[in-house]
Amino acid sequence: MKNYKIVLLSGDGIGPEISEVSKKVLKKLSRKHNFNIEIIEKLFGGIAYEKYGTPAPDETLDQCKKCDAVLLACVGDIKYDSLARELRPESGLLKLRSALGLFANIRPVKIRKSLVNTSTLKKEIVENVDLIVVRELIGGIYFGKPRGHITNTKIPKAFNTMVYDSAEIERITEIAIKIANQRNKKICSVDKSNVLEVSQLWRDTVLNITLKDKNISLSNMYVDNAAMQLVRDPSQFDVILTSNLFGDILSDLAAMLTGSIGMLPSASLNNNGPGVFEPVHGSAPDIAGKNIANPIAMLLSASMMLKIGLNEEEAAKNLETAVDKVLAEGFRTADLADGSSEVLSCSEIGDKIIDEI
């Protein structure tokens, strides 16, 4: 029997509620598929700041480095917005990514048949959407230096630097190639090479790396056009490869094709060592504690963790199938309610999914 150790970071807002559902689901899966899973819970985000004065305590980061995978719920709350930037819950995410060397963010966007009518776009536009956004995570304008404010002038200024080296682009391209080879072997690289030198390097490097794999079909698209095409004809995409800033924007745009951001998981990976698996949605403090949050994105993130992080593919498939069955039977959380479905609480839909496993 295999033994796994994961760190669970419940974080803020609805995090504890969806984490509780995830713990129950993982325990059920471990019994059914004959593996042991030790779940170590640590403070992270705003709740960690309240106790330790930092959103990412050293103890939490050290434990994350030692585990097989990290399952993260969500962080943040408007009450922390007045803190210095490095003390806000969201900065803890940057510290976690840096500590684990997580350079690749993988975000699947798939329309589940039972939810096709929840999208704000027409059914015929979204019904065949099944794409993955591969986003470079620790480079680009979010991390580039120099950066800062100039306030001792008549007109205040602020500046950031978008910078990539070819090695950073090469390694994220290799991740995209690996994923594309498991799918339809199509990559669309998104940049702004008509005006940005950094995007010119991006395009050249991606081309050079993909040419080494004759199975891969590469196309290029400017980011403004990519945003338009994701709304006009999203099913044309299979694997979208892009930089940190562009990926941040496009992945959220793609998320809303599904009708609810509460349905989408993600994974942040490195070449070796534990990855972080987390839902796309935020902490939703306005509904925290009401037991009405949608836990499915968290559960699908757990499924990605099982498949990618722990190599328990059968358990991952079992969980996804259970989710689909519950949705097909017409059960929904409030964010997915369509008037004809039965609306369940966070814990109730979790119990339904457990029953289907």
From Swiss-Prot:
Site entry (Important for catalysis), positions: Y142, K192
Cofactor note: Binds 1 Mg(2+) or Mn(2+) ion per subunit.
Source organism superkingdom: Bacteria
GO cellular component labels: cytosol
This protein's pathway: Amino-acid biosynthesis; L-leucine biosynthesis; L-leucine from 3-methyl-2-oxobutanoate: step 3/4
UniProt cross-references to SMART domains, sorted A to Z: Iso_dh (SM01329)
Residues engaged in binding Mg(2+): D224, D248, D252
Reactions catalysed: (2R,3S)-3-isopropylmalate + NAD(+) = 4-methyl-2-oxopentanoate + CO2 + NADH
Subunit-structure text: Homodimer.
The name this protein goes by in its record: 3-isopropylmalate dehydrogenase
Species of origin: Prochlorococcus marinus (strain MIT 9312)
